From Swiss-Prot:
Main location: cytoplasm
PROSITE patterns for the chain: FUMARATE_LYASES
GO biological process, one term: arginine biosynthetic process via ornithine
Gene Ontology MF terms: argininosuccinate lyase activity
UniProt-recorded name of the protein: Argininosuccinate lyase
Top-rank EC class of the record's enzyme: lyase
Length: 459
């Protein structure tokens, strides 16, 4: 038997089965159930307080919603596709439970402002969760920086060895990136944390409602000033998806680093066994599946951003049913980014650096820049110094030798300005600690950065 539509008074025919199947959103928007109930309870309390409905009915509504909330939490609630969405399912269940009083809940409210209120409550909570997860990740990166401050490794440009750095400098680089990600989400909260309820379908409400009361009940810091904007705008969700995409890009870069560094060709990093998988045929394999999936899921989040941008780009004001398609991309991105941050955090916490391998790789021709700087400090124009040291590198490469093997006599063949102290520059630790500029890889700079982040993250 087909359920009677709550909006069916104007129609002479039952809804076609195809339309019910095509337009339903309950298969995914039940994610909003608890947020919808929270919004409805605040609305009901306000209706009773304002005398718009009898206080007794308001109390019945709140009690009925609390019962439904418990059923949902216990997975006992029966969802009906023919009731279209989460909001209609809950309202119908409420009316069945408490009778005519349930029909008064929708007084002074439209599904348009109801839906977007639940959506904002959902996004507000999950954005704060993401901020907290990012901060936990930052703490793990800070711990790794402290653990490996006395380990050197090569920094890469073009995936070629560039210059030696302290490993702590590498971990602090990602800590900085995730700080900006976190700040973007924090800033996004300002535009999420706005109450749309009370805007009605599009033009406002002709009952003496108290939006300030509802905002306080629901914990919103602001009330949206324009009813058209409140019910039809999704820029806050687009901003959220953009932030997710940028954050996923940073996590994908870290994942790529770890995939490369944990390969046998590099062997810089040992990943925890419990966070890797094996092969069905090759017994020696230790696959970085978590990292690979984070790298792969990044494209999925990009797609979600493009999906919603495409939905909203041609919509006239105000609400259009197209906006039903805002939920899927956001729900999927929330699940994806939260899982990815947790995965990266576990990887960071459990990884171990191979000190011997990283130190060996940090030497060699990665030290060449400092020989050029040595000559520049003695008055040689840097471009000329660069050419001289390039000739030294070519000389050694042709002999199959590393830079550390060169003697002072050989250096003097290329420039008489080389002295005994130039040989000290053939140590990656010495070279790293020459980078004393603010933000550099010298130990004194790294200790200063660690002190700074300790105050920020562990206050």
């Amino acid at each position: 038997m087909q359920e009677k539509k709550l909006w069916g008074g104007r129609f002479s025919e039952s809804t076609d089965a195809f339309v019910e199947e095509f337009t339903e959103s309950i298969s995914f928007d039940k994610e909003l159930a608890l947020y919808d109930i929270k919004g409805s309870m605040a609305h009901a309390k306000m209706l009773g307080k304002q005398g718009i409905i009898p206080q007794e009915d308001a109390e019945k509504i709140v009690k009925g919603l609390q019962d439904i909330e418990q059923e949902i939490k216990e997975n006992k609630f029966v969802w009906k596709k023919e009731l279209e969405d989460v909001h209609m399912n809950i309202e119908k269940a409420l009316t069945d439970k408490i009778g005519k009083a349930g029909g008064k809940l929708h007084t002074g409210r439209s599904r348009n402002d109801q839906v977007i209120t639940a959506f904002r409550l959902y996004l507000k909570e999950n954005t704060q969760d993401i901020i907290n997860l990012l901060e936990d990740l930052q703490r793990k990166l800070l711990e790794k920086a402290k653990e490996y401050i006395d380990v050197v490794m090569p920094a890469y440009t073009h995936l070629q060895r560039a210059q030696p750095i302290r490993a702590a400098h590498y971990f602090l680089a990602y800590l900085e990136m995730f700080q900006r990600d976190k700040e973007r989400f924090i800033d996004n909260l300002k535009r999420i944390d706005m109450l749309p309820l009370g805007s009605g379908a599009v033009a406002g409400v002709d009952f003496p409602i108290d939006r300030e009361y509802v905002a306080k009940e629901l914990g919103f810091s602001q009330i949206m000033r324009n009813s058209i904007d409140a019910t039809s705008s999704r820029d806050f969700a687009l901003e959220f998806l953009s932030n997710c995409a940028i954050c996923m890009a940073n996590m994908s870069r870290f994942s790529e680093d770890m995939i490369i560094y944990s390969s046998s060709e590099f062997s810089f990093v040992e990943l925890p066994d419990k966070l890797t998988t094996g092969s069905s045929i090759m017994p020696q394999k230790k696959n970085p599946d978590v990292l690979e999936l984070i790298r792969g899921k990044t494209g999925r989040v990009y797609g979600n951003l493009i999906s919603l941008l495409t939905v909203v780009k041609g919509l006239p004001l105000a609400y259009n049913r197209d906006l039903q398609e805002d939920k899927g991309p956001v729900f999927d991105s929330v699940k994806t980014i939260k899982g990815s941050i947790i995965g990266i955090t576990k990887i960071v916490e459990g990884l171990k650096l191979n000190r011997e391998k990283t130190q060996l790789a940090a030497g060699g021709f990665a030290l060449a820049t400092d020989l050029a700087n040595y000559l520049a400090e003695k008055g040689v124009p840097f471009r000329q110094a660069h050419h001289i040291v390039g000739s030294i590198v070519g000389y050694l490469v042709n002999q199959g030798r590393e830079l550390e093997s060169i003697t002072l006599e050989e250096l003097k063949q290329f420039s008489h300005l080389f002295e005994e102290d130039a040989l000290k520059l053939l140590s990656p630790f010495v070279v790293a600690d020459r980078r004393k500029s603010f933000g550099g890889t010298a130990k004194e700079q790294i200790l200063s950065q660690i002190e700074y982040w300790d105050k920020i993250l562990n206050k």
